[in-house]
């Protein structure tokens, strides 16, 4: 199935404000894009991208005083099937989890 994805977001500020935004399709799904994926900023500002430790695309920019509009509109193809569920997966108490998975339980700084 084809899914149209998009957003229009407005930010308002009275001073320059550095910002990180995770508003992009995950790179693992780029092969499913049927139209270009491009974030449009108005007014036009420099925007830089990097990949975080999970492979997500992070947009880095500074909001100008006054306001900024971000928009994106694209089409992605998807099977429509739900993610697989492991019906016999065990539930573990937090205190029994291995240390290497605790990072996924930490709160975001934002």
Task: Name every feature range the model reports, one short phrase each.
Residues 69-110:
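Acidic low-complexity segments
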Residues 1-81:
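Intrinsically disordered, low-complexity N-terminal segments that are enriched in acidic
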